[in-house]
């Protein structure tokens, strides 16, 4: 059996988009009804992906805005990023673009493993960001995308499996011309 691989994942996005709800639902299998702004929490969970065991450290961050400074602990030693927006908030969707730019500037790279997550998919009557907009952004960034509902535990595990997939894509690149591209779930 292959040795366990360690991976650090940062969950970033605007305030009140459900970063903590996604993380707690994934790690502890329950939805937190009340809202308490997060300063920062770190969770651990073992993930099995394609037969490989991953010991993950998931850093649930405070909400970002355009004036937030990306903390170096959110870039140094981080293997991948889960960028979360609320499907009910166009401004939170715009904020993931700013956060990604900050990550790329801070890391000095053109690409990092990212999954973009449109959270609160259960609030479809209040939708402000279409699935097509989310998919288009993921295609532009050559990254993974999914919508999720932390409340109903829909696609929550999928979001974290996708970030492991993106991380492994970087760690074990495919030969050129294999026709593989973005993953949209």
Swiss-Prot record:
Name of the protein in its database record: GTP-binding protein rhb1
Entry annotated with the keyword S-adenosyl-L-methionine: no
Keywords per UniProt: Cell membrane, GTP-binding, Hydrolase, Lipoprotein, Magnesium, Membrane, Metal-binding, Methylation, Nucleotide-binding, Prenylation
Modified residues (Cysteine methyl ester): 182
Motif range (Effector region): 35-43
Residues annotated to bind GTP: 16, 18-21, 32, 35, 38, 119, 122, 150
Chain positions recorded as Mg(2+) binding sites: 20, 38
Gene Ontology molecular function terms on file: GDP binding; GTP binding; GTPase activity; metal ion binding; protein serine/threonine kinase activator activity
Physiological role: Binds GTP and exhibits intrinsic GTPase activity. Regulates entry into stationary phase when extracellular nitrogen levels are adequate for growth.
């Amino acid at each position: 059996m292959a040795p366990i691989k360690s991976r650090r994942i940062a969950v970033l996005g605007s305030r009140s988009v459900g970063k903590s709800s996604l993380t707690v639902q994934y790690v502890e299998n329950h939805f937190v009804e009340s809202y308490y702004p997060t300063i920062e929490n770190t969770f651990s969970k073992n993930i099995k992906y394609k037969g490989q065991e991953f010991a993950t450290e998931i850093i649930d961050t405070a909400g970002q805005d355009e004036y937030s400074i990306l903390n170096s602990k959110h870039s140094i030693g981080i293997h991948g990023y889960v960028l979360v927006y609320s499907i009910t908030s166009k401004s939170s969707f715009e904020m993931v673009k700013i956060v990604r730019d900050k990550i790329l500037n801070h890391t000095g790279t053109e690409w990092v493993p990212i999954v973009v997550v449109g959270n609160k998919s259960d609030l479809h009557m209040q939708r402000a960001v279409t699935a097509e907009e989310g998919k288009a952004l993921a295609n532009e960034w050559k990254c993974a995308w999914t919508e999720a509902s932390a409340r109903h535990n829909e696609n929550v595990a999928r979001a974290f499996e996708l970030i492991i997939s993106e991380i492994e894509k970087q760690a074990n690149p495919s030969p050129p011309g294999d026709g593989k591209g973005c993953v949209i779930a």
